[in-house]
Amino acid sequence: MLRRYLEAWFPIMGSWNVRILFIDGFAGPGEYEGGEDGSPIIAIKSLLEHRARKMISAEVQFILIEKKKDRATHLEALVNELTPLLPSNCKATVLNSAFDHTLTRVLDQRDAQARKDAPCFVMVDPFGVADTPMDVIGRVLRNPKSEVYVSFMYEFLNRFKETPEFEQHLDRLFGTTVWRDGMAIDDQERRKQFFYDLYKNQLRRAGATYVVHFEMYEGQRLVYAIFFGTHSLKGCDRMKQAIWKVAPFGDFAFRGTRSGQLSLDLDASDFGPLRRAMSAEFRGKGWVTIEEVTKFVASDKTDYHTSQIKSSALVPMEDAKEIEVDETTRKRKRKYPDGTKLRFR
């Protein structure tokens, strides 16, 4: 999924900016026990193997942060193997230190170099809840071109929520003490939703315009939740496309978190929730343009992406007479070019 998104992010950001940064805050050793590439190596290879690499004129910096010495050393060895293959405008650096303090220092250096507008993609995939304070995430989101991808370890949080020594970590994680209200909720699903909604709202308060949220399961076991914060409508849509392209894979499956929008399976997808969401949004508003519908679906108000609008939703809706189309705004039946006007019934 990370590779899918970066395949779009690198050429878009790398063509229009002087410098771009990929920051992995909990980079790990660079590979898993089975030999599979970890996120920092995936990121570097996604650039090296990109068919549009020549379009990326920006200076690209990979900043890979790992707190544990042995993991950082192993990662550095893997990065050194790839370094000779990197183009002259790219550099990868491994930093053996803690995420929160190091990211603050990196952003301070960026700002001091008059590169405050340099886009950043910051990946935060911790084990646990410490070292990921909301104020640091907010520092990233102050830049309108920057994005954060956070793995939210709900099961870890749920396990230690009543452990006094973790309270200060949770205060910093959420950037508020309101999380304590969730401790009184007995129902597990309601409690989980409370924490999810709080974290999503805190990301918005920290500066994110859109927050994409999905859960990843292994079988029936929740592994973690993903929160992607961005200022870009296109980025929001691209992330959802990336998630759908890899869902499901092996024993893993993604689930959307909007009401009724749960199973993300490309081979057996249910687009009923998308149809219902569009109807709920636009019914009673008279004629709306295809552009308005596209903007709604691209946003974080649905778990779907814009490539699914026409053939998967509008065509069956038109066949079922759930929408009316102004025929003067198109030339062919069951087609919805720019400027098409629709009325939802």
Predicted feature residues:
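Charged catalytic carboxylate motif
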Residues: M1
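SAM cofactor-binding core of SAM-dependent methyltransferases
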Residues: R4-V106, T306-L314
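Short His-Asn-centered micro-motif
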Residues: I65-K67, S97, M123-F127, S151-F152
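Class I S-adenosyl-L-methionine
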Residues: D111-C120, F127-A320, D326, D338-G339, ...
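Short, Lys/Arg-rich nucleic-acid/phosphate-binding segment
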Residues: E327-R332
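ATP-dependent adenylation/nucleotidyltransferase module used to activate substrates
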Residues: A52-I56, C120, P126
